[in-house]
């Protein structure tokens, strides 16, 4: 039986025997791949252990701790989080077994990232050889992917499932009903991790459309994939619509031509630099007199390049419907792109192993150095500066208690979640809301929604009036200070920085 991409051209197998690496070289390549695997797993765990949770991750922990799956589903149905329930359910069962510590909660992401990297390696290896399979692996370590290997969020799972779907499409029999079933199931499962995973079907649709002929029926895998995505999204649409109605119009990362232009540099932050270095190496290793005619592009490579269309489809979706456009939403494009690059390089350099080996060393070294820098300074991972703010707050806690303050009121919604989680006095941490109840910050509104299911303290101005003398207001905005003065409060700055603290009378 043939794989899904073997219908068009026979050039889908690995390199011929004349271009295969020697057995000894293959052993070294496999050893190198094993070393990279261990390195990224170990360093991801180390980084996970040396940085606190931040806002999004604390939401994951709080939702995992909800009393029942019914409560979890109800909370998501009332816009308590942006994500579908798949990842939350995984974390709920995982955390019941292994606890809620930073390493335990982040470990599934590290494992999913490693699994996805190995799937991409195997896929590229089958289509080319072990050397170029490792190039696909190493290229991904130079993308935004490693960051999500130590974050308790669903993006590593999103990546892994996208890689698995690509592997099933390219490396299993075309007409197998079981292959079609698993392809549809994996794409559907990806949608339970992130709503934008519906876009994973786009490159496969483009592949079949560009090769369609009158009378030709869609492949079983494509039919199964469309059904899998459609059925799961239809089941989850009430949850998605609940969040969309409340937040899409004011979402902070809206689509724009500038944002679209920045997508690929965000997916591969050092991509242009690495490309320049690779081209310099290609010029240095050019061997005159050797044949340079490249074989025809493999169908799998062409499919991989179609993964570049996922952010474009996402831009259209964001403009027409969701108003949400962030690079991490397209992490599912990475497996196809990595395999396409490996296949392209194999076609042009399979008679020049030194060129490919140099590019592998460049990518592997750059990814490893970048990861090692993060290992040395995990504190540099500071989304929106909130982890620095958290450290400043925790240093102030005892001084506030010594001053008799028993109500710690935070104006910053992200800091509120983090302080609530790490404070020695979590029951005293309170988020300040607007008196009119018209909250415009999504980070406030999701906390208000979640507060119906997960205990947290929220105050308005009238609550503050009853406990002003025992309250410390942390990091207030200028608008908040002016509003308090207009309300008749005597505002005094106890600490001016790095985290301002206001006492009230």
Task: Name what the model sees in each region.
Residues 1-26, 362-363:
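Short, intrinsically disordered terminal tails adjacent to the first/last structured region
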Residues 27-505:
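Terminal, non-globular segments
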């Amino acid at each position: 039986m043939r794989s899904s991409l073997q219908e068009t051209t026979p050039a889908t197998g690995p390199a011929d025997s004349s271009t295969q690496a020697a057995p000894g070289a293959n052993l070294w390549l496999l050893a190198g791949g094993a070393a990279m695997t261990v390195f990224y797993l170990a360093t991801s765990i180390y980084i996970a252990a040396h940085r606190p949770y931040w806002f999004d991750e604390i939401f994951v922990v709080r939702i995992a701790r909800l009393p029942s799956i019914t409560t979890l589903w109800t909370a998501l149905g009332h816009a308590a989080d942006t994500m579908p329930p798949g990842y939350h359910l995984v974390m709920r069962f995982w955390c019941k077994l292994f606890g809620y510590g930073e390493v335990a909660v982040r470990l599934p992401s590290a494992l999913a990232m490693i699994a996805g990297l190995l799937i991409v390696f195997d896929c590229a290896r089958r289509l080319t050889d072990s050397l170029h399979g490792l190039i696909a692996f190493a290229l991904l370590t130079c993308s935004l992917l490693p960051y999500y290997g130590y974050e308790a969020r669903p993006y590593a799972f999103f990546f892994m499932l996208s890689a698995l779907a690509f592997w099933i499409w390219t490396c299993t029999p075309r007409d197998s009903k079981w292959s079609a079933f698993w392809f549809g199931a994996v794409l559907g499962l990806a949608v339970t991790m992130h709503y934008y995973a519906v876009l994973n079907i786009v490159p496969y649709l483009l592949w079949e459309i560009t090769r369609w002929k009158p009378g030709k029926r869609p492949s079983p895998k494509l039919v199964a994939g469309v059904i899998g995505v459609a059925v799961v999204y239809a089941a989850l649409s009430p949850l998605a619509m609940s969040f969309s109605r409340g937040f899409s119009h004011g979402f902070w990362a809206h689509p724009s031509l500038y944002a679209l232009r920045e997508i690929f540099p965000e997916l591969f932050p050092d991509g242009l630099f690495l490309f320049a270095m690779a081209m310099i190496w290609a010029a240095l290793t050019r061997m005159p007199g050797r044949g340079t005619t490249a074989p025809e592009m493999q169908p799998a490579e062409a499919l991989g390049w179609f993964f570049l269309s996922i952010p474009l489809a996402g831009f259209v979706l964001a403009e027409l419907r969701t108003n949400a456009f962030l690079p991490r939403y397209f992490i599912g494009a990475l497996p196809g792109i990595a395999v396409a690059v490996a296949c392209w390089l194999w076609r042009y350099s399979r008679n020049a192993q030194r060129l490919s080996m140099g590019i592998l060393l460049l990518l592997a070294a750059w990814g490893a150095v970048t990861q090692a820098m993060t290992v040395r300074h995990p504190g540099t991972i500071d989304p929106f500066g909130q982890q620095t703010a958290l450290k400043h707050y925790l240093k102030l806690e005892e001084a506030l208690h010594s001053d008799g303050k028993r109500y710690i009121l935070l104006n910053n919604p992200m800091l509120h979640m983090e302080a609530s989680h790490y404070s020695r006095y979590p029951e005293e941490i309170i988020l300040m809301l607007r008196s009119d109840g018209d909250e415009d910050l999504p980070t406030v509104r999701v906390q208000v929604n979640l507060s119906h299911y997960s205990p947290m303290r929220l105050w308005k101005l009238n609550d503050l009036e009853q406990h002003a003398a025992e309250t410390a207001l942390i990091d207030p905005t200028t608008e908040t200070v002016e509003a308090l003065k207009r309300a008749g409060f005597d505002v005094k700055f106890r600490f001016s920085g790095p985290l301002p603290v206001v006492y009230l009378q």
